[in-house]
Amino acid sequence: MSDPAILSATGVHAWYGSSHVLHGVDLEISRGETLGLLGRNGMGKSTLIRTLLGHVTQREGQIRLFGQDVSRAKPHEVARLGVAYVPEGRGVFPNLSVRENLVMASRKGREGRADWPFERVMETFPRLQERIGNLGSQLSGGEQQMLSIGRALMTHPDLVILDEATEGLAPLIVAEIWRVIGQIRASGIATLIVDRDYRKVLTQSDRAVVLQKGQVVLAGDALALRDSAELAGYLGV
């Protein structure tokens, strides 16, 4: 990888109460790189993401973001550095219109890896353009998730983290979201993706990391891993 790491995790451990979930995880993402995070349910993927974002308080190890040590940072401090998070849930304001949701997310004056002004978000999501005056509560689940991704892009991030962003959505919406993920990748924004469709993740990623019981057990070039028997064994496919 020629570009320096914008996110690096070294020896990361995490606990929920007395439950030790992450066991010395090492992970790195370079500028403009897309990393796929794979593993069966309950293997620590979402916990790792929540730990990187500062949501898990019981943690050890070093996490560096854009050269800064954020090992003890709070979620809002991580976000201010240029990280946008799109979870499975629909992160929109139900009582605000589509336009108001997007405008609220905009961080004027911040220079990210790529510029996603309001007009570009509208071009990216034609469905949202058609519903620009609708309240968030009036949108379908898929449209709300599109709006959540649009809000993330309006913050002009250098890193977008998508955690099961297509979960439970209709196939047409899923295809639309993957199309947008491809555009995000092409724009030079670094991306960390978790999704059940591991083949799609590998197609859209530069590299992939596999978690098993809170540990990294496999890592490498995404396309090279697609037909790996070792990967199939870890994922149970």
Residue spans for each PLM region:
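ABC-type ATPase nucleotide-binding domains, specifically the catalytic core motifs of the NBD
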Residues: G17, T57, A73, L96-W116, ...
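The feature captures the beta-strand-to-loop junction immediately N-terminal to the Walker
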Residues: L38-R40
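Walker B catalytic motif
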Residues: E164-A165
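Helix-to-loop junction immediately C-terminal to a conserved catalytic motif
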Residues: L53
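ABC ATPase C-loop
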Residues: A152-L153
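Conserved ABC ATPase signature
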Residues: L135-L139, E143
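Conserved ABC transporter NBD signature motif
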Residues: G61-Q68, L81, A114-F118, G220
